[in-house]
């Protein structure tokens, strides 16, 4: 490890049972790092225990992990941001392996992969979490062409340029998915780091609701699909309209050639409407695709200018 600054950032909600051990473990593994705990309206002694164990404690009143991460990214300045949950499910022993590629300039985001070595399948006791992770991985691979080993992990390290140019849109547990999609779409360098996983200790409860938060994650993927890949998104929408329009219209066309009449005029009008919506969706996709490309070019120029002249200039860090 070099002398560059590391911030261990821990979003917390009612983690009094485990937060003390988590802080101690990261102080042991990364003695040069500053540990930040952001208390998100905890009703237990999370903030008091975190303070007693030497963490810098701050408070975020807007409920939700995404809201906490947004504020952490705005508040904290560091060369490497190591984000971890406060539930003691992620090993501090992997911290150096996650931070090293960030600090030596070979990655912009490292991802703590719980799945490759099988420990998540062995330790996780919550139904459908593994299925949900695989579903999200498959969706991201289909849309963006990148295969994450573990897309939902809460243990990852990020560079300063990545953090300071990442627009947090989500409010809750969609943040991990949003981080992953942003990294892929903006071509940041990503490195998977296999880690051991352990389930929450007895008495510690997960804040993640499998069904409602799962729906929010899928909705976030759809929203970012529309924003980042508008041509592909609206082409699929146009295809759906075309299928319905043709299913309604072909029998009417056949009947017209046979009889010279259009007896089901309302159905014909509906079929024509669906075909019009098909064309409109395609046009929308082409227009928004042009807008998205211009925005992406501008984003790249802004990041490049900051690397060259601004906050990210660092002789020890390679440009993207």
Named regions from a protein language model:
Residues 1-2, 170-320:
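Hydrophobic helical membrane-anchoring modules
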Residues 5-7, 34, 178:
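Cell-envelope/extracellular polymer assembly enzymes that use nucleotide-activated donors
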Residues 61-75, 80, 92-173, 199-215, ...:
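Acceptor/aglycone-binding surface of glycosyltransferases and processive sugar-polymer synthases
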């Amino acid at each position: 490890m070099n002398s560059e600054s590391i911030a261990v950032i821990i979003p917390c909600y009612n983690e009094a049972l485990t937060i003390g051990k988590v802080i101690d473990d990261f102080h042991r593994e990364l003695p040069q790092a500053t540990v930040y705990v952001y208390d998100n309206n905890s009703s237990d002694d999370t903030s008091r225990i975190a303070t007693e164990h030497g963490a810098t404690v701050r408070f975020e009143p807007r409920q939700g992990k995404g809201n906490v991460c947004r504020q952490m990214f705005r508040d904290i300045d560091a060369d490497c941001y190591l984000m971890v949950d406060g539930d003691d499910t992620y090993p501090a022993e992997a911290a150096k392996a996650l931070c090293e590629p960030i600090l030596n300039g070979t990655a912009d985001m490292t991802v703590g992969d719980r799945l490759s070595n099988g420990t998540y399948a062995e330790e996780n006791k919550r139904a459908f979490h593994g299925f949900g992770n695989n579903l999200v991985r498959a969706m991201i691979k289909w849309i963006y062409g990148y295969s994450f080993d573990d897309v939902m992990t809460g243990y990852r390290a990020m560079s300063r340029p990545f953090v300071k140019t990442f627009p947090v849109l989500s409010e809750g547990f969609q943040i991990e998915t949003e981080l992953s999609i942003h990294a892929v779409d903006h071509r940041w360098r990503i490195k998977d780091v296999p880690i051991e996983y352990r389930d929450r200790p007895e008495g510690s409860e997960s804040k993640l609701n499998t069904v409602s938060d799962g729906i929010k994650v899928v909705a976030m993927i759809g929203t970012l699909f529309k924003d980042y890949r508008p041509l592909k998104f609206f082409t699929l929408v146009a295809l759906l309209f075309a299928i319905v329009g043709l299913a309604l219209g072909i029998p009417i066309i056949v009947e017209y050639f046979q009889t010279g009449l259009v007896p089901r005029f309302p159905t014909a009008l509906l079929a024509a409407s669906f075909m019009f919506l098909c064309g409109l969706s395609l046009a929308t996709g082409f227009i928004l695709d042009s807008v998205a490309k211009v925005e992406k070019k501008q984003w790249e120029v802004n990041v490049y200018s900051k690397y060259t002249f601004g906050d990210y200039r660092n002789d020890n860090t390679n440009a993207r």
